[in-house]
């Protein structure tokens, strides 16, 4: 296991930078890479590419003086930690290579969380850190994809790609759901797609509002 502190190696600038590639570009042997965001920042956005080195799996950029470090394994697992003035209270963008499938885990809380994953293959998603506002844009599902949300939010928005479906199971802490068709108690469906595919979204945390839409 290799720990890489990008700021100290001058790979990612401490004063804000353009996207910089990770220095451990070994592709995952299983076909699924894993990103874990360990701690929060004021704003975190995860998007599909571009990654400047074709073999690299992720790159980051930020606004404001800050630093970050990443713990990488040869199997394509990356654990990302933000730091800097204000305890990492900065705006971060993480760009993921489009080639592998991704398992994404967000553990740290943020004020604004944007997961624009529409250009990726998403194999699973876990959001354990809370956010004031959360937007999750999901690509066409190639199989049944689990999405677990255990971190609370004032407002959660899920955008499902055309040609895919999503089923939301709402926990008792969820106050209101907009969009989607209710199916039984606290269960909602949006979109349509092939059998045995789609997103299974389970929200077990508290939320004032969840919005379901189809792009």
Which residues are covered by each model-predicted region?
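Sec-dependent N-terminal signal peptides
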Residues: 1-6
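C-terminal motif of bacterial Sec signal peptides marking the signal peptidase cleavage site
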Residues: 10-13
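Short, surface-exposed interaction patches in beta-rich subdomains
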Residues: 20-24, 46-51, 56-88, 126, ...
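Post-signal peptide N-terminal segment of mature Sec-exported envelope proteins
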Residues: 22-38
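Edge/loop elements at the starts and ends of beta-strands within beta-rich repeat scaffolds
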Residues: 28-31, 73, 97-100, 120, ...
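Extended Gly/Ser/Thr-rich low-complexity repeat segments
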Residues: 88-101
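Right-handed parallel beta-helix
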Residues: 105-134, 138-142
